[in-house]
């Protein structure tokens, strides 16, 4: 549980503390060690808990889904800087979702297409302009999908067919598109790295098994148009080297744009956290060193 975890953290801190001190001194730092602070010490922890509770009471804290880096082997999330990238050979598949879908898409991960809820095209791409806003029901390799054609300036016209299958649950970029366009989010890869029940006949398969089955199905239906060899950067866990899966997870969020009024507070009078943060920096009530970072 939580308490046991925190005890292990404290053990690690005790072991590492002297090493960190020596490293800092070797770098030439002359610090006032009497003012040393630790993120999880009593004073800092109390301040964080008090502020979290206050923000929760002011309706500034809410819980929602967010796509995270997930290691199916370690069963844990990874920060962006804990993800390593390894160049490897990969296949780029070009295919149509179904015979009655009007155009093809290209992807290196056909198994994630089981969770597609839209297809994005660049608004400047005249090939697809007439399809934007339309919706299609397709039978993709034996799984029913409802796809909406959306326009997004981030789509690279020159990559693949210029049409991007949007998988909100398993791509950071696609998740942002889904939020912006109010698209459904369907999780087809679970924490164990296997296909979920949402993908019907492929449930329980590994991603590689599902990929092979889907490509076989597309070939059988005459929908696979092209299979190209490319170089691809694979995201892997820095600890074990397992391929990282982007999956949605429950996270805590701060509503930085929500306007609130706090009685007796001179700042929060129908203003958001973002607005107040900018105001106090501009007035010089909070100093940011060096000053050049005030513009960020």
Task: Give the positions of each predicted feature.
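Residue patterns forming the tRNA-binding/recognition surfaces of aminoacyl-tRNA synthetases
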Residues: 1-103, 159-296
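Protease-associated
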Residues: 99, 103-166, 170-176
């Amino acid at each position: 549980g939580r308490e046991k975890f925190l005890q292990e953290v404290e053990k690690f801190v005790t072991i590492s503390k002297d090493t960190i001190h020596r490293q800092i001194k070797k770098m030439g730092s002359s610090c006032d060690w009497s003012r040393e602070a630790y993120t999880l010490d009593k004073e800092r922890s109390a301040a964080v808990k008090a502020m979290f509770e206050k923000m929760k009471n002011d309706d500034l804290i809410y819980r929602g889904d967010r796509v995270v880096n997930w290691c199916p082997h370690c069963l844990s999330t990874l920060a962006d800087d804990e993800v390593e990238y390894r160049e490897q050979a990969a296949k780029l598949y070009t295919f149509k979702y179904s015979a009655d879908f009007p155009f093809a898409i290209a992807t290196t991960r056909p198994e994630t297409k089981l969770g597609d809820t839209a297809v994005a095209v660049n608004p400047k791409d005249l090939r697809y302009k007439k399809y934007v806003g339309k919706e299609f029901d397709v039978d993709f390799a034996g799984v029913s999908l409802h796809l909406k054609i959306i326009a997004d300036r981030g789509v690279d016209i020159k990559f693949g067919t210029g049409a991007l299958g949007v998988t909100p649950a398993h791509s950071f970029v696609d998740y942002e598109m889904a939020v912006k366009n109010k698209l459904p989010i369907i999780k087809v890869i679970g924490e164990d790295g296997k296909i979920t029940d949402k993908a019907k006949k492929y449930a329980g398969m590994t991603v590689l098994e599902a990929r092979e089955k889907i490509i076989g199905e597309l070939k059988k239906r005459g929908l696979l148009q092209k299979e190209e060899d490319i170089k691809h950067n694979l995201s892997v866990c820095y600890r074990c080297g397992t391929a990282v899966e982007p999956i949605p997870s429950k996270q805590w969020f701060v509503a930085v744009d929500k306007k609130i009024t706090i009685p007796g507070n001179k700042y929060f009078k129908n203003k958001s956290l973002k607005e107040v943060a900018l105001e106090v920096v501009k007035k010089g009530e909070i100093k940011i060193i060096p000053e050049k970072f005030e513009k960020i």
